[in-house]
Amino acid sequence: MSPQTETKASVGFKAGVKDYKLTYYTPDYQTKDTDILAAFRVTPQPGVPPEEAGAAVAAESSTGTWRTVWTDGLTSLDRYKGRCYHIEPVAGEENQFIAYVAYPLDLFEEGSVTNMFTSIVGNVFGFKALRALRLEDLRIPTSYSKTFQGPPHGIQVERDKLNKYGRPLLGCTIKPKLGLSAKNYGRAVYECLRGGLDFTKDDENVNSQPFMRWRDRFLFCAEAIYKAQAETGEIKGHYLNATAGTCEEMIKRAVFARELGVPIVMHDYLTGGFTANTSLAHYCRDNGLLLHIHRAMHAVIDRQKNHGIHFRVLAKALRMSGGDHIHAGTVVGKLEGEREITLGFVDLLRDDYIEKDRSRGIYFTQDWVSLPGVLPVASGGIHVWHMPALTEIFGDDSVLQFGGGTLGHPWGNAPGAVANRVALEACVQARNEGRDLAREGNEIIREAAKWSPELAAACEVWKEIKFEFPAMDTL
């Protein structure tokens, strides 16, 4: 080796491992309006300082690797690196910290949720220096959100398409979720829609199985929709699940739904993937279809409070990728959902501008700059006695979805739908008259049951049903 080369190597490059915090922990950094900001809940391994753990997250989710490399000198590390700019302890938790990381916008491909997640969470969660890691929230800058189409249509366009205003929409998941023939499935759809529901729904794992192929299901459901519309004078829909093994097959199913003239299709966005979901959302906007999103598999990712990704992040990602509805918990039913946290991500789905509010788990102010909103769907173990609370909690811009709470009615599917519609109309009227749904809800339902035998029967069946378990995910 020549003396010149030896000198250059010794001065400009030093092989080996170095502390991440020397490069990636920058507490004096002033965040930019164009930065993507992330809040991570970090649990370091014993002996790892929180500053080093936060810096490691910033490094491994941006430009860093485990050692200094020659090619570091061929780019501007200062321009492209992620920066851990603030760390704070988590109240009431030992050895847990919130690490705030800023990412330069140039690290991300425009209009790609897939690339965003691959960068931010794709590799760092297996890092040895961390015992556990959870992505609690993201701030999406307006300069990045404007590169996304977002929901195919949004809340106002959906209401205009359906000609339904001033109340939540009502839905029902057809049960049993698996095993029905296409004709019997279509019959259940018709009975529920005829009874007063706005939508019925394929369950998330109804795709194209031997007992009911997708094309047969689509045909019988379309027949049910048109028959119910003719008899009620209302626009009806059924969430036809287009999720498939390939993107090409998924689009083929959406095309067939459009040819049938139905208003809405459905996708399982986490199991199907963000690339497939964005492709379907673009097709739906171009062809006038609404898009219902199911969050199957979400609890695998978001349920543990110290590891994974919080659902508010998955909800933001869905609004960017595209969907007109998404399941969002209930607060009162059988599935997970703590009230303030749930209302926090419901606002992130629906509103244009959401202020930072740590009491609801919102770590950053989020400006969606008129990206269309998403209707939250409440489903899972809910029935007529829950109607006042659901109406108060979720408001008009929501879908309230009763599966067993419709089909479990002792008189059949149509009376179950009637009971839910009567309960909803009674709650909306009482609210509009200034009554307190939280305090007077049960009395409102009892009053309506006096003139609706279907509701009276439903009230009797579900008066003792409760799901009394504490929420796992609390602040």
From Swiss-Prot:
The modification N6-carboxylysine is found at residue 201. It comes from Castanea sativa. The keyword Magnesium applies. SUPFAM superfamilies: RuBisCo, C-terminal domain, RuBisCO, large subunit, small (N-terminal) domain. This is Ribulose bisphosphate carboxylase large chain. Binds 1 Mg(2+) ion per subunit. It is found in: Plastid, Chloroplast. Mg(2+) binds at residues 201, 203-204. It catalyses: 2 (2R)-3-phosphoglycerate + 2 H(+) = D-ribulose 1,5-bisphosphate + CO2 + H2O; D-ribulose 1,5-bisphosphate + O2 = 2-phosphoglycolate + (2R)-3-phosphoglycerate + 2 H(+). The modification N6,N6,N6-trimethyllysine is found at residue 14. The lineage of its organism: Eukaryota, Viridiplantae, Streptophyta, Embryophyta, Tracheophyta. Belongs to the RuBisCO large chain family. Type I subfamily. Residues 1-2 form a propeptide. The record marks 334 as: Transition state stabilizer. HAMAP family: RuBisCO_L_type1 (MF_01338). Pfam families: RuBisCO_large, RuBisCO_large_N. Keywords: Acetylation, Calvin cycle, Carbon dioxide fixation, Chloroplast, Disulfide bond, Lyase, Magnesium, Metal-binding, Methylation, Monooxygenase, Oxidoreductase, Photorespiration, Photosynthesis, Plastid. GO terms for molecular function: magnesium ion binding; monooxygenase activity; ribulose-bisphosphate carboxylase activity.
